[in-house]
């Protein structure tokens, strides 16, 4: 054995385990391997591909590969009239289409400098918050499936069906609504709609707490998310994060509160940020908790909208604007707090055409996903699933 050790080059470390077993460090070294995850992998929530560089089970680098769902949204928007862009915004974040319509309508109305009826504003906020709850239910339910918990998915989608039924009653569609138009709404809500919404709030309020506890009281779920994919607040800000992702890192930033649009300044609600008691601030569990507790705040906003909403007597669902819109020459940026963060639209008008000269969409999903390299570095391969699920991406908005 001693003769064998003498024959080993000095550059190779020798570890003596016993008289008969000598382990050379060179034999234990591993080579880095490229692992392709997706674009058909079920945990990527769409056609996302991750090219991962791994050292054994540890991820050293993960690079998102995008473009599989690119649909030329911006170029399409520049070739149709301003109001005709609304149905295309539905197909960005198709799980929160009402919020996408809202953001676009706000931007064009800012360019037109027009005033919207108060009843329209409250209805817009109401349906947007309903859609926010439905979106968070998808995020929570599918996150449970990603990590092996099937029961929460069933409960989440049971309650989401109720919301989709209410939105279908108001707009005529379950997911792609085309309801929030430039200047107002497609039409007023049905006669008993607000009564049904209030009944839903009373029903869902205890359910929201139950759904939040269903996963956070699950020991396996907590171990899979606690301390995984930590993003410090300063790094999150530098990346341009927003929404539950930024709030999950402990930053109390919500456009509805910090830069109010529509009538949010008249509404009272809390901005949900983790307190660090149940999670490491900035980890996957923190981001999940933000979404879970935001649903109750959305219920508070909805009930306030119903209380403050003016009567429908003599109500016109649209402001007095011409059928063909020709905004004055200029540019404008409008933004709104979508379920996944800030969705913004930059629109440029030449003052002559009925079509935007330039229409740029700022996607929160794209920005949040861009931090995948930092989030995944040093994590285990199975933890990539937990990290992707915590980002809650919609590839329709990422690729546009």
From Swiss-Prot:
Keywords: Cell inner membrane, Cell membrane, Membrane, NAD, Quinone, Translocase, Transport. GO terms for cellular component: plasma membrane. It catalyses: a quinone + NADH + 5 H(+)(in) = a quinol + NAD(+) + 4 H(+)(out). It is a peripheral membrane protein. Coiled coil: none annotated. One of its GO terms (molecular function) is quinone binding. Transmembrane segments: none annotated. Its EC number is 7.1.1.-. This is NADH-quinone oxidoreductase subunit D. It comes from Chlorobium chlorochromatii (strain CaD3). The lineage of its organism: Bacteria, Pseudomonadati, Chlorobiota, Chlorobiia, Chlorobiales.
